[in-house]
């Protein structure tokens, strides 16, 4: 039996109104993330990736379409349901440390606060705090304030806070955006370890291609839609096999590098072969 996906987006549309002008940030985006996957969602500024993360985190609602995370239909959440969703179903790691950690609490107290809100107290809480700090490799820093830690260690602490209540899904928004290369690799390695050993589904939203090279599956988003996917057999090796995504309306976006290399623009010719589709420039002569 196939496991139910942890993240499902079906034809998501998000329209904003700014000064009487409508901006369509998402244009029928479709995405599926299976349990235990670690996926990077990559896109340029304005591609819609941050809008998507806002919806998946339950902080925003789509104008149309459906988003389901950890079996929770985000479009049907009540206020109580949204609170339960944030406490138990998902964890968040944001780029800005101020959104991850309370500055006047120690790292251990930050983790403990999440557990206290969820009703976990006493020895169970203390044990979970020790467990999760050790899991992310900062067990010796629990008594320190966030300001006493480097940016990389602060992000590891943020991962610990996000994992405190054993969520099914971890959402990360540019988690390495403010870090140097060494610290960024340590944060990504920790996320991989959490993904592999805890079975937590991880979705990383980023514009950084080097982040994409550290995960097995990369989904690119462009113009508010998923455009291509890359699957890697070996992390850190050469680029993996490239996939194009066909949405439910039958639309397909070719990788931009393919378009540039072959001079594809405006219209292209399609020919159905035995086991593939041949794509040629629209100005090529038709082979008879």
Question: Which role fits each region the language model picked out?
Answer:
Residues 138, 142, 157, 162-163:
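ABC ATPase C-loop
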Residues 170-173:
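Catalytic Walker B motif of ABC-type/P-loop ATPase nucleotide-binding domains
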Residues 145-149, 153:
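Conserved ABC ATPase signature
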Residues 65-73:
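Conserved ABC transporter NBD signature motif
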Residues 103-113:
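Short coil-to-helix segment of the ABC ATPase nucleotide-binding domain corresponding to the Q-loop/switch region
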Residues 72-73, 112, 116, 123-141:
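Conserved ABC ATPase "signature" region
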Residues 20-21, 74-90, 122:
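ABC ATPase NBD coupling module
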Residues 87, 144, 164-165:
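Conserved signature/switch motifs of ABC ATPase nucleotide-binding domains
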């Amino acid at each position: 039996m196939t496991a139910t996906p942890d993240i499902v987006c079906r034809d998501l549309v998000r329209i904003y109104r700014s000064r009487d002008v409508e901006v369509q940030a998402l244009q029928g985006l479709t995405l599926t993330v299976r349990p235990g996957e670690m996926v990077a969602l990559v896109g340029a500024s304005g591609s819609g990736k941050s809008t998507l993360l806002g919806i998946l985190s339950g902080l925003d609602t789509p104008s149309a379409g459906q988003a389901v995370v950890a079996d929770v239909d985000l479009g049907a959440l009540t206020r109580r349901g949204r609170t339960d969703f944030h406490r138990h179903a998902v964890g968040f790691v944001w780029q800005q440390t101020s959104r991850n950690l309370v500055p006047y609490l120690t790292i251990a107290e930050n983790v403990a606060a999440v557990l206290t809100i969820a009703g976990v107290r006493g020895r169970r809480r203390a044990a979970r705090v020790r467990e999760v700090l050790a899991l992310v490799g900062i067990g010796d820093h629990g008594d320190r304030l966030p300001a006493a830690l480097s940016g990389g260690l602060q992000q590891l602490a943020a991962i610990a806070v996000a994992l405190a209540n054993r969520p099914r899904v971890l959402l990360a928004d540019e988690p390495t955006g403010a870090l140097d290369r060494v610290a960024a690799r340590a944060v990504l390695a920790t996320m991989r370890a959490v993904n592999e050993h805890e079975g937590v589904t991880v979705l990383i939203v980023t514009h950084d291609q080097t982040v994409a090279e550290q995960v097995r599956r990369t989904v690119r988003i462009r113009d508010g839609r998923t455009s291509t996917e890359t699957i890697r057999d070996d992390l850190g090796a050469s680029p993996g096999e490239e996939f194009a995504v066909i949405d439910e309306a039958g639309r397909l976006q070719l990788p931009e590098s393919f378009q540039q290399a072959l001079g594809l623009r405006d219209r292209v010719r399609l020919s159905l072969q035995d086991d593939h589709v041949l794509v040629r420039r629209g100005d090529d002569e038709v082979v008879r």
